[in-house]
Amino acid sequence: MAFSIKMRASKGDKHISGAETIVMEKENIENITAGYIKRALEHELGAPDFINIKIDKINKKDIIYIDALPIKTINCKNKEDARRVAKNLLKNEGISDKLIEKSFKIIDDGGMRGAPILNLNGERLEPDKERGVRVKNISTTEELKEKILKNNIGTDRTVDAIAIASKVINLGVIAELCTSDNNSYTTGYVATKNGYFRITNLKQENENGGRVFFVKNDTNIEDLIYKLENKPYIIK
């Protein structure tokens, strides 16, 4: 058996921190959970008043292994330049200007615990509009993490995000737009079938963050949400 470890921390209704991984040996559970608790308690958004650790058994045969999306960093001098880059990447996937503007407004308004799912008509498909949808049961291999960090391809946040992005694109999501909910981290990304594009200055310091998923109009939304939340993926 393998084990899925998830951490969520909050203060009142405000999300503070979240992390998760999949471990193959139960001996690793204690160190991982201790690290997650430390991460939550020392978060820049403030000390949480609630930390939840959840550990679930997973059958190793149910885990899907996929390659990470190729990572490319696009350096932008300011938010306006960065958003123009993001917009062009999304337009290349058939997403309209109007829908892109709507997605940025959702992100900039903040406050969501998960991500909204928008079809190409601009309709929100997730059943709980306040909660959104969370991508769960994901992890990266140590080899991928080491490659990203040692080669200066990205940061620890990149390691976390590449797992989400690679899984959602593998499940048929057209694109993902994301900025961090950490106040000081201004690099965001667009993920498509063509790669994971890190974009510097996609938001300014102390602005809200969030993510949006774009899907085809004929997407089976119940099936997609089930797989996003429950199907275990390890990204290599």
Swiss-Prot record:
Principal EC category: ligase
Cofactor(s) for this UniProt protein: Mg(2+)
Enzyme Commission number: 6.2.1.14
Keywords annotated in UniProt: ATP-binding, Biotin biosynthesis, Ligase, Magnesium, Nucleotide-binding
One of the record's GO molecular function terms: ATP binding
Pfam families per record: BioW (PF03744)
Function of the protein: Catalyzes the transformation of pimelate into pimeloyl-CoA with concomitant hydrolysis of ATP to AMP.
Name used for this protein in its record: 6-carboxyhexanoate--CoA ligase
